Structures are given as C-alpha cells and as structure tokens.
C-alpha cells in the first residue's frame, strides 16, 4: 500500500467520442467539437454557416462509417481504454478519487468536477495529451475554468500542461516498440505520426510542433536509431489551410518509390487508441501504403491501459501528494 493524500482528487481529461457510431450521434459530437474556437480559429460569423451548412452535412455520415469499423462491445475504444486507465490509477490507492472526463461529449468536465467538488480539497487536472497545444490542452483548461468560475469556493487546483519529455513516458513508448519488434521483427523505417495542426497556430506561438519533435527524437535516441531509420509526420489534416508537414499519408504514398516497402507506424501523441489511430492509421493509411507498392505495414498500438501507462501518470501526479500530505 502507498500513503494516500486523502484530500486530493485527480481528473483525467481526454478528447471525447460520440455516444454511438451513427450519423446523428456523430453530428452532435462534431458540432460541439468544431464549435470550439480553440479548435477552429476562424471568426464565428464566418465559421457558423460553413460548419452547419457544409461540414456537418458532409462529414457526419462519413465519420459514422469510420467509427463503426472500430466500435466494440464496450462502445468507443477511446472511452473504454480511458476508463480502464482510470481504474488502474484508482486501484493504486494514492489518491482519494480519480475521475475521467471528455472535453467533448460525455462524461463532461463539468459533471466530473461537480462530483469531485465535495469529495476532495485539492484537484489535479491531467489532460491526456503528452504534447501541449492550445487546441487540446488549452481547451481542456478552458473547460475547467468555465466550471470553476461558477463556484463560490474553489479548491486548490493544479494543472499539468504537458509531459512530452517525461523520462517514464519516453521509455514506456520505446519499450513498447522494442517489445513489438522482438515479436514481429524490425521494419525498414519507423514512422512517427502525430496529430496535425494548422501551421498558422505554430506561427502564433503554439509549442506543439517543437514538443512533437522532442518526443520523437527522445524515443529514437532510446531505440538507438540512426537518422535514416525513422521519420516524423503529421496526420488528420482538416480543411484547405496548410498544416504541419510532412503529411503522414503523403509520406506513406512516397516511401515505396524510394525503396522503403516495410514500415511500422507509431503515434506517441495519442494516449489511447481511437478513431485516428485504429481507423485512419491502422486501416486507411495502410491501404494507401500497400496501394503505392509497399509490402508490409504495421501499426504499433498506443500505451492504452497498460501498467506502464498507469506508471507514467502516477509519476506525473505523485509530486502533488506531498503538497497535501
């Protein structure tokens, strides 16, 4: 048993998921997600008609089909893995309460903060985004503040902004890759794929790209990879604006013509597997690579609810125990 900070609670925040793989549920989820000004930095008066008259009409059905390909008996993989990860942290016994919330969809940040409100005196908020971006971590902070500003008594609050260079995080991802290679063999190239971001966000000061680079370099160093054995890419581009390059899908289409026909793809920016990894990376991008002449394409799963992942989060949260002991 570990010493417990009886007054300290933890709120893990993940992005979110529709409640069902149906056009109606996906449309509701996308409306909330894409209405966040942190996510789409376009004036509302211009974005509202585009979102409601074009985007939601065209993407809801297509996205619902993609969700159906990865849906499980427990529902959304993202929610199920996050719940399992929460259970591992709770079982460790160091915190009085551990809850999860989704930035978009359910369970909401407001609901889970209200549940923690009367149970603890200190709340540690940990968004499950290793690399900081205003569109993810910043938005999670907004959601927390939107709730707290309605409370008369606000508990002590600690907010963890990123953990892109956490030694435990880097080593856990590297260890998962080593284990995968021990079982399946090594590829000709390891492709790191992080969620993309409009380049204008970086130009305005978002540290996301530099943190992705630091993470990939740190993992490659632990794996003792030479510069020509790995590369960094970005996925999930949305809209017509320029996003961070190189684009993952374009890279995968080009590699076979360069003589690279065996690749492994890993996505260290995703704490748990979700639509973007299980459908976009593991299925759609695989088809693109094989269609371009590739021979062997493998996706290395996220850390999900593994003991190593729980250990990372405990390491990030543990310093706050001393503050309330």
From Swiss-Prot:
Its main location: cytoplasm. One of its GO terms (molecular function) is ferrochelatase activity. Coiled coil: none annotated. Fe cation binds at residues 195, 276. It catalyses: heme b + 2 H(+) = protoporphyrin IX + Fe(2+). InterPro entries: Ferrochelatase (IPR001015), Ferrochelatase_AS (IPR019772), Ferrochelatase_C (IPR033644), Ferrochelatase_N (IPR033659). GO terms for cellular component: cytoplasm. PROSITE patterns: FERROCHELATASE. It is an enzyme of class 4 (lyase). The keyword Lyase applies. HAMAP family: Ferrochelatase (MF_00323). This is Ferrochelatase. It comes from Methylococcus capsulatus (strain ATCC 33009 / NCIMB 11132 / Bath).
């Amino acid at each position: 048993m570990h010493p417990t900070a009886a007054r300290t609670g933890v709120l893990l925040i993940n992005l979110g998921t529709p409640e069902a793989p149906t056009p109606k549920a996906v449309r509701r989820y996308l409306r909330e997600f894409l209405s966040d000004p942190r996510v789409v930095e376009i004036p509302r008066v211009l974005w509202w008609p585009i979102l409601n008259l074009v985007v939601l009409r065209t993407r809801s059905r297509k996205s619902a089909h993609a969700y159906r390909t990865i849906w499980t008996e427990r529902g959304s993989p993202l929610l199920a893995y996050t719940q399992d990860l929460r259970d591992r942290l709770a079982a460790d016994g160091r915190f009085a309460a551990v809850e999860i919330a989704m930035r978009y969809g359910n369970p909401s940040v407001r609901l889970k903060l209200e549940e923690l409100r009367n149970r603890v005196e200190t709340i540690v908020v940990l968004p499950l985004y290793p690399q900081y971006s205003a569109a993810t971590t910043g938005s999670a902070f907004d959601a927390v503040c939107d709730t707290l500003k309605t409370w008369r008594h606000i508990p002590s609050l600690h907010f963890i902004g990123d953990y892109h260079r956490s030694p435990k995080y880097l080593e856990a991802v590297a260890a998962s890759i080593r284990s995968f290679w021990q079982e399946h063999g090594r590829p000709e190239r390891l492709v790191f794929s992080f969620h993309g971001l409009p380049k204008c966000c970086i130009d305005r000061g978002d540290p996301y790209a530099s943190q992705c680079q630091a993470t990939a370099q740190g993992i490659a160093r632990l794996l003792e990879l030479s510069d020509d054995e790995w590369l960094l890419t970005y996925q999930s581009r949305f809209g017509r604006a320029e996003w961070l390059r190189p684009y993952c899908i374009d890279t995968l289409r080009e590699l076979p013509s360069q003589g690279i026909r065996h690749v492994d793809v890993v996505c260290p920016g995703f704490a748990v597997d979700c639509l973007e990894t299980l459908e976009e990376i593991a299925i759609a991008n695989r088809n693109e690579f094989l269609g371009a002449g590739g021979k062997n394409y493998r996706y290395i799963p996220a850390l999900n609810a593994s003991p190593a992942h729980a250990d990372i989060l405990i390491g990030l949260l543990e310093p706050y125990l001393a503050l309330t002991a």
